[in-house]
Amino acid sequence: MGNIKELQTSLANKIAAGEVVERPGSVVKELLENALDAKATEINIEIKQSGIESIRVVDNGTGIEEDDLKLVFHRHATSKLHEDSDLFHIRTLGFRGEALASISSVAKVTLRTCTDGQSGHEIYAEDGAILEQKPAKAKKGTDILVESLFYNTPARLKYVKSLYTELGKITDIVNRMAMSHPNVRFTLTSDDKVLIKTNGSGRTNEVMAEIYGMKVAKDLVHITGDTSDYHLEGYVAKPEHSRSNRHYISIFINGRYIKNFVLNKAIVEGYHTLLTIGRYPICYINIEMDPILVDVNVHPTKLEVRLSKEEQLYQLIVQKIQEAFKDKILIPHNDENKLYKKNKVLDVFEQQKLDFENRTASNPPAEKPDEETDRVNENSDTQAFQTNEQTSENGSDASYQAGQRAVLQDLEGNTKNSEGLFDSEATSNEAASAEIESSEDDVRETEHAKPHRRVPYMEVVGQVHGTYIIAQNETGMFMIDQHAAQERIKYEYFRDKIGEVTNEVQNLLIPMTFHFSKDEQMIINQYKDELDKVGVHLEPFGSHDYIVNSYPVWFPKEEAQEIIQDMVEYVLEHRKVDIKKIREEAAIMMSCKKSIKANHYLRNHEMADLIDQLREMEDPFTCPHGRPIIISFSNYELERLFKRIM
């Protein structure tokens, strides 16, 4: 008798559910995708015990026809695909027909639905099978209640993280869905406490204000761009709002949130020297394209995709982000001590603290990304974000919105300054929208003005510890890192100086020796002609070694061997020779070594000359490594610090 047997349907469904339903957040994601595909304009999510006890998703979409109810919990039953060719033209978020079957295999599911002009129906399912179906009163749309998740798979239940972690996962999913569908009103309630509430205005920056706070929202820069294949639109935050991990990078393709290492890299490259190593931006980017150019049928979670013409899209993202910051004023303001303000908010609203970067309540990271670079440090020490409790006994929307806006403003330091840019009394959604619109007007004015000098005029006051220059003008005080300032000046000088291609080489009396493994040698040999074209002639020397007898004259003598090593490593990683990138790295290296260091005292006229040179730079706000050069203190901030203004 043979050993191979066909699995029972219930067991096969549980195995398949392991890929689709990893945690409570997976259930929320699948149900939200179904609601959005049903053209819902309002979606309410209610969870108990972080989704372990129950998850309820109510939408006002098209609903499910009575004749379709008998198939709704069958695996691979869907209304979104009909033939093979449809798989290459997917515009819906769901398409596999696995979600409800997988959920009902590991939970108890009650589904109530009603289509336009028809009577409502209710069905109840366990273990993937419908146990009851009956008529029921229902509004147009679908109401799904998922209870006792993993009740029949205790091994899965024990791998569920803490309630705060799971709540964080759910909040993250809703946040991203709200960003990609700003025209939909989302409400997330956890144990009767409202955590997220969007107004469905259709403005992505308003949703981002709810998630990240008004301070970040005011510093969002709109980007847009087109090629023959792609339409790109999004918002990128100024570099001063950078974070310690990639979690705050949100990329969407045709409204679908995805994870893609190459596109993440393009975004970071777009910021270029505006970010320090290990810092990543807050941004939202949506790319519209013909579905035939993207394969979303890679993994059941639908987070991974394969892209056609990926390099073209990479270049578009880099270009548009660089253009966005080209003429912006990027001097960061000093933040006042946030501890006092946080404590004040806690006293007033008695909130439950959920750490923003520890993946608890608001905008937490996905814990199981497929690229290691997307993982979030559990112990990240960046700023916290407080979720909102209703502040009145009747839980009215007005009270909630007022409390929410006050919390967001206090936590993000969004208080009134001398220019009147911040209004601590603007606690309604309407006021927030007006502030965002005003900020966008300022951006448009700046773009039209395009000033040549982006650093304002300032007078030197003195120097601190031979490291920082103190300067002032009528608006306030400035601190300048003298090493970073001269590093930027020399970087742009060397970058331009070595920017012209030359075939002149420096011959060596004693050749340089380089060692590479066999697999690396195969790649080097493949690209040897390209290396020769840029003046790097690698000659085999033994079984694993190469020698170099000359190098281009623009290589700094002291760093020539290091530059050649970096050049070859770049080829090994990227499978191409990028002379522009190599020359830039050389310029960074030279500028750092030749700039004045800390504890070097300067005369006043030397400091003034340094500032004047900095004002002429193309990008005067960060050194080539991304560290800030200038920090400003407005007159208002100084008066607040000394309690002259309360």
Curated annotation (Swiss-Prot):
Source superkingdom: Bacteria
PROSITE patterns: DNA_MISMATCH_REPAIR_1
Keyword terms of this UniProt record: DNA damage, DNA repair
TM ranges: none
SUPFAM superfamilies documented for this protein: ATPase domain of HSP90 chaperone/DNA topoisomerase II/histidine kinase, DNA mismatch repair protein MutL, Ribosomal protein S5 domain 2-like
CDD domains linked to this entry: HATPase_MutL-MLH-PMS-like, MutL_Trans
One GO location term (cellular component): mismatch repair complex
GO molecular function, one term: ATP-dependent DNA damage sensor activity
SMART domains in alphabetical order: DNA_mis_repair, MutL_C
GO biological process: mismatch repair
Coiled-coil boundaries: none
Entry-linked Gene3D superfamilies: 3.30.230.10, Histidine kinase-like ATPase, C-terminal domain (3.30.565.10), MutL, C-terminal domain, dimerisation subdomain (3.30.1540.20), MutL, C-terminal domain, regulatory subdomain (3.30.1370.100)
Positions with biased composition (Low complexity): 424-436
Segments of this protein annotated with the region Disordered: 356-380, 415-452
InterPro entries with a match to the protein in the record: DNA_mismatch_repair_CS, DNA_mismatch_repair_MutL, DNA_mismatch_S5_2-like, HATPase_C_sf, MutL/Mlh/PMS, MutL/Mlh/Pms-like, MutL_C, MutL_C_dimsub
Annotated family: Belongs to the DNA mismatch repair MutL/HexB family.
Purpose of the protein: This protein is involved in the repair of mismatches in DNA. It is required for dam-dependent methyl-directed DNA mismatch repair. May act as a 'molecular matchmaker', a protein that promotes the formation of a stable complex between two or more DNA-binding proteins in an ATP-dependent manner without itself being part of a final effector complex.
UniProt name for this protein: DNA mismatch repair protein MutL
Natural source organism: Staphylococcus carnosus (strain TM300)
